[in-house]
Design a protein with these regions (language model features):
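Nucleotide-activated donor-dependent transferases that construct or modify glycoconjugates
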Residues: 1-21
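Active-site proximal beta-strand in glycosyltransferases
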Residues: 3-4, 107, 122-142
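Short N-terminal targeting/anchoring amphipathic segment
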Residues: 97-114, 118, 128
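Short beta-strand scaffold positions
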Residues: 109, 171-172
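Membrane-proximal helix-turn-helix segments that form the acceptor-binding/catalytic region
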Residues: 150-169
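Carbohydrate-associated surface elements
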Residues: 175, 197
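Acidic anion/phosphate-binding donor-loop and adjacent secondary structure
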Residues: 198-206
Length: 206
């Protein structure tokens, strides 16, 4: 099986601790590694943010790769500006797959912007999409301390669009499942709860 993993706005190999680097980066990287252990080939597609970084990086083991796809300026950009380049990102993934002669059996997208790209790939490749949001705009707005912290309609509408399109939505917890159902009206038959795993080689009793 070949999986196209999408992490549009942040690279799973990025240094942790920045504004847009943290749990999702670790999740995508470790999930990709573990799928490789099971003999599943994964290409993780992310937007190129540095022209000096090789576009294809073999750093996730078992032949799995991170592919940096040019989409807009190859520099870090604020999230609202990133949305502009999602169509270019999807088009260049399609071109990459065609040039390499790769057929992907499944798309697994992370965060809502990756989901928008996944919808374009799904239309081209006719394969199912599994989506994980990691955070939800409406939930963030509920706990925002100021207007500046609130997410705009472009994100909320984008999330709803992705929820309608996805074949399955992964929730990490029952609480997240409830948020998807009650805040967005997602059918519970579309949601599957898969709790994040633990790397027992790193976390163990002492």
């Amino acid at each position: 099986m070949n999986i196209a993993m999408l992490s549009y706005h942040t690279c799973p190999l990025a240094t942790l601790g920045g504004k847009d680097t943290g749990g999702m980066n670790v999740y995508v990287a470790e999930l990709t590694r573990q799928l490789g252990v099971d003999g599943i080939h994964v290409d993780v597609f992310t937007r190129s943010q540095d022209e000096h970084v090789p576009h294809v990086v073999h750093s996730l083991g078992y032949g799995n790769r991170v592919v940096h796809i040019p989409a807009g300026p190859e520099v870090p950009l604020p999230k609202p500006e990133l949305a502009t380049y999602i169509p270019t990102f999807a088009e260049n993934i399609i071109r990459f797959a065609a040039e390499k002669g790769i057929h992907y059996d499944l798309i697994h997208s992370h965060y809502w912007m990756s989901g928008i790209a996944a919808e374009m790939l799904k239309a081209e490749w006719k394969v199912p999409v599994i989506q994980m949001f990691h955070t939800l705009g409406l939930m963030k707005n509920r706990i925002a301390q100021s207007e500046e912290e609130k997410e705009g309609d472009y994100r909320i509408n984008g999330e709803r669009q992705v929820m309608r399109m996805a074949d399955r939505i992964v929730a990490a917890t029952q609480a997240e499942e409830a948020q998807l159902e009650f805040l967005y009206g997602v059918d519970d038959q579309k949601i599957v709860i898969i709790p994040p795993g633990v790397d027992v080689s790193r976390f163990y009793p002492i």
